[in-house]
Amino acid sequence: MTSATPNAPRLLVVRNDKLGDFMLAWPALATLKAASPQPHVSVLVPGYTAAMANACPWIDEVIIDPGDSASRKAQCQLLGMIRERHFDALLTLFSTRRIGWLGWRAGIRLRLAPATKWAQVFYNQRITQRRSHSAKPEYRYNQELAEAMIGRLGLKPATVAPPYWPEAAAGRPEQRQRLAAQLPLSTDRLWCFLHPGSGGSAVNLSLDAYAHLVEGVDRHMLEIGQPSPHWIITAGPGEEQHADSLVDTLVNQGSSAFRQPPQPGLEGFARSLAAADAFIAGSTGPLHVAGCLNLLTIGFYPARRSATPLRWQTCNSEDRRLAFHPPQGAGETDMTTIDLETAAASIAERLSMVETSSQSDCSGEAS
């Protein structure tokens, strides 16, 4: 968290859904904090993402949203908290009726949101985006709303760039040292983190498909004269058994695979990802954490318009992204139609451009 300029505008930003959605709001939050005079930025988030909000360098205050199903008493307490802070503006990155009604009742003078659905009636500044067309990345839609807010407040904008979690990205050497003390990893080989879980919402490859992919990457790396990577398998809550099963399969097929050691909570897990040379997953929250760390991300996406690789693109640098999805004409969510052999070859080619820690300086920065 950070501190704002005295007498600066007080903003309330709302993105109160899943981890991945919240991580894709960090570029917008960075855009707001880069403006001058620098505003005070509070966020309204669910308890699940509060730890990450507290770790975000672009946030001054975190307010917990009790959610749609909370009691009337809890909703009234939230309204009181919002009122007593005397916010100058409300920026809702994803508009809902409850949040629009909350901002209106709290008496926030400037209320800005996407012009979508009937919840927009509670906002006096509406930005037409047509997100359902998925013509841009989600994080760019969020940044456009932040840029509009900066303009409405008469602030001076500034350019921002990855990494959007610079402090955690700078902790890469420490995270690598910690992991090397826990697992028998060589710095002569790349450390590829693989997250096979779905978080309950994202479409992802099956465990068998990931095993096939890893075998292909290992084989292609050896064919081009590079050592195969170490594979560190991560897991979210309730996904541990699947992760263990994948590790067993990979070890049995001859890959160098390990389960990531337990981490202290969501923030600890998120920070630990900085140790990776590459992060592979479906379009899940951890993939977007890796994007904020400006890691090399390798994502597997469905082909439906609301969930394309473009729409849910990670917010790292353009040259640090690879994405795969079902071919045209296949089922939108049929991940079995992705050509894993072609994907493995592309991944191996990109990994061959990354320097191992033993080849680079002590920062371990991936190329």
PLM ranges: what are they?
Residues 1-367:
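Catalytic machinery of carbohydrate-active enzymes
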